[in-house]
Amino acid sequence: MIQKRKTRQIRVGNVKIGGDAPIVVQSMTSTKTHDVEATLNQIKRLYEAGCEIVRVAVPHKEDVEALEEIVKKSPMPVIADIHFAPSYAFLSMEKGVHGIRINPGNIGKEEIVREIVEEAKRRGVAVRIGVNSGSLEKDLLEKYGYPSAEALAESALRWSEKFEKWGFTNYKVSIKGSDVLQNVRANLIFAERTDVPLHIGITEAGMGTKGIIKSSVGIGILLYMGIGDTVRVSLTDDPVVEVETAYEILKSLGLRRRGVEIVACPTCGRIEVDLPKVVKEVQEKLSGVKTPLKVAVMGCVVNAIGEAREADIGLACGRGFAWLFKHGKPIKKVDESEMVDELLKEIQNMEKDGGTN
């Protein structure tokens, strides 16, 4: 069992982060924030997918102006993403955001960062210190020669110490780079020296399978080491995919369970059914199920039930038929044309019982 790193607990709106709270899944909208309707529609989709905190970009004044309505109508806490324009941090807090994300390296003078922190303290707004390889302080680049893991960690520790000195503790830190091992090492260095909650992810991971794999490896390593209080899978894709991927990573490590986890055999010469087609149909029809269930779809009856005995329910497919099984025991033989519908009926019954029977 994974032993999670002990961190202090903070709050972003009504969401607890760190301490004994579960790891929180975040994402970021890809809409123009000033397009309130599009932004709220995407926030709704993210929320329905399981997102618990959402970040929005505020590069322009019109984006800041849109925040009040977005915050008011959002079903989850909203974080304003601030870069290069410290005035937008103050304005965003006036509009009621629950948190702000700043990169001190591109904000400017230390006095300005402190003023932002003092305002956040006054308003009860959480702050995320964002450190990444693309905007490291000049003196650290000169010291290390490049954005090394040590340089990134030192930057994060430097600003963390300043926040503590200023009497502000409702903050978390993110240390991100596009290199997986550098990212892991930087977070490990920071985690060994402080109890500040960490937001983890791999920046600029890319799109499709490559982006998902890169993020899964980087995030998975840190989570296995007990590091990470909030997580975002950064992909060049629909942000809903980020949320879905984050939950798959957490489910794989036994850290969160939400919705259906489908397991299926890799196929071999024994299968008598178009298994990829069946799995895809099952995935699509179960996408709206919120009850944590493990569903197995196996391509033959030889070892299927034994191999999938840890599943809550599943199908072991044969030629023209399938065995429907629950908790490792066959309960019904069904025709191939009816097997998916029979599986769905049984899952609906399990949902009514809370997934236990």
From Swiss-Prot:
Changing residue 307 to C: Loss of activity. It comes from the Bacteria. Changing residue 103 to D: Reduces activity 200-fold. It catalyses: (2E)-4-hydroxy-3-methylbut-2-enyl diphosphate + oxidized [flavodoxin] + H2O + 2 H(+) = 2-C-methyl-D-erythritol 2,4-cyclic diphosphate + reduced [flavodoxin]. [4Fe-4S] cluster binds at residues 265, 268, 300, 307. GO terms for biological process: isopentenyl diphosphate biosynthetic process, methylerythritol 4-phosphate pathway; terpenoid biosynthetic process. Changing residue 55 to K: Loss of activity. Changing residue 307 to D: Reduces activity 500-fold. Binds 1 [4Fe-4S] cluster per subunit. Its cofactor is [4Fe-4S] cluster. SUPFAM superfamilies: Enolase C-terminal domain-like (SSF51604), Nitrite and sulphite reductase 4Fe-4S domain-like (SSF56014). Pathway: Isoprenoid biosynthesis; isopentenyl diphosphate biosynthesis via DXP pathway; isopentenyl diphosphate from 1-deoxy-D-xylulose 5-phosphate: step 5/6. Converts 2C-methyl-D-erythritol 2,4-cyclodiphosphate (ME-2,4cPP) into 1-hydroxy-2-methyl-2-(E)-butenyl 4-diphosphate. This is 4-hydroxy-3-methylbut-2-en-1-yl diphosphate synthase (flavodoxin). It comes from Aquifex aeolicus (strain VF5). The gene is ispG.
